[in-house]
Amino acid sequence: MEITKDIRYIGVNDHDIDLFEGQYDVSENGMAYNSYVILGDKIAVADSVDAGFVDEWLGNLETVLDGRTPDYLVVHHMEPDHSAGIAAFMERYPQAQIVASMGAFRMMVNYFGTDFPERKMVVKEGDVLDLGGHSLTFIGAPNVHWPEVIFSYESTDKVLFSADGFGKFGANDIEDPEGWACEARRYYFGIVGKFGKFVQAVLKKAADLDIQIICPLHGPVLTENLGYYLDTYNTWSSYQPEDEGITIAYASVYGHLKAAVEELASALEARGQKVSVFDLARDDMAEAVEDAFRYDRLVLASITYQGEIFPCMSTFIHTLAEHAYQNRTVALVESGSWAPAAAKVMTKELEGMKDITLTQNKVTVLGSLNDASRAQIEVLADELSK
């Protein structure tokens, strides 16, 4: 695929994968592993692909090279889905040099038993790789989302090679009916979201560049309305809500708490609120995390289980904390048969999160819904709708 006259796409699509990084469901739309070629007087290849697709990738590269020989392999990120082809590339093209950060070369020793000492070129912030007619200026992007990561900027065609930044779930040969944001959001908050301050740092560097195209390592090449993508990443990485709305995440066993959640959702919608509801035992938890970060309010609803909260709720709260959940209003709904304690437990688990505001009101369901707990639902719906 031609991105510009001299920059080509040679990535691959994976339709066999079911779980990305062993946990994120991509069974419906697959995954893309992106790689690029910059054709100057010298030729640079940007990143490789996952181990199962190295032969296909090398075939794509040969087609674009059209008899020429690459001079450089630029490694922006060492995660195996982007670095598995390094050794095969270096063997096939013995005159090529490998360009990466010092941190990436240290990782190469761990993965390949060598850092290709006779052929390596270590780059850092501000270094320039001159290809003749094109050049790559390197931008340090540590912890977006691994410590060795670098971005690069090609100044002739004004292209940012952004490693895992601006990536999304889904293969590139399938059109996503939901557009970019939904699966990009799930990808960001699942994989990159913990490292918001590092994303903020690299966005500040990118603000000084004239960027016309963004080439990430997953998902589509971004060529239009780039301000939208940059602004969205700024919102996500600063942990600000993207939209007004309420996510309800619940864990119910016999249906009594589920009934309370359904009544609360209906009461909120009747008050004009946008509501998304997740059964944590059955729904995709990554989507629940995504919406918890997307909206400005969150309801946590759990049964009391062995004096604690239900395991999937504990996992959900832990995942939010692990990804630096903050700047939100949170309400609690609990249930129990004789001594409800879930709200107390959830309150304690939320204590370590930054700028979390608990609502004044909560809902307690003792056994099943009754007039008292229904009244609490109405009061909480009023507070959440202010």
Label for each model-derived stretch:
Residues 41, 52-99:
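Active-site metal-binding motif and surrounding structural segment of the metallo-beta-lactamase
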